[in-house]
Amino acid sequence: MTKAKVDNQLKNMPGPVSIKKNQSPWREYKLSRIANAKDTIGEITPGIDVYALTMGQFDLADVMEHLLEATGPADVVVATWTAAKADLDRAEVFLKDKRILSLRFIVDQSFPNRQPGYFNRLVNKFGEGSVVVTRSHCKFLLIKGGGYSFIVRTSANL
């Protein structure tokens, strides 16, 4: 397909279309040795766009907690290749104390066989409908609430 055909199709599509995101004037790049997500990410404001490289001193659950402080109760999707018991425990606490209104996990098809205990815990704690099993190595976090929609791309598992 030629560029002209693609451009024409995009022009005729209904609603907003985004092919390439222009650099945000609010984008911050950080290399952090700070020990927590809150101080590394900083204040949450509309239009925030932060790229943070860390030394592994905090995890995805810490990022989730900081973002949930900004949103208040929110709907959450976690895509992970594997999950640790401590992070599953934290997600359960966030759900019980209503920081998370709904929670869905997307996990790799190998997870049930690789980590049957953790997989069964996911299903038992959060419900069968809360776990999607597919071929995936993606790691991301989606949070929507309080007028915010966050997308967190990460190399870290939950």
Q: What residue ranges belong to the model's regions?
A:
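PLD/PLD-like phosphodiesterase catalytic module centered on the HKD motif
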Residues: 1-158
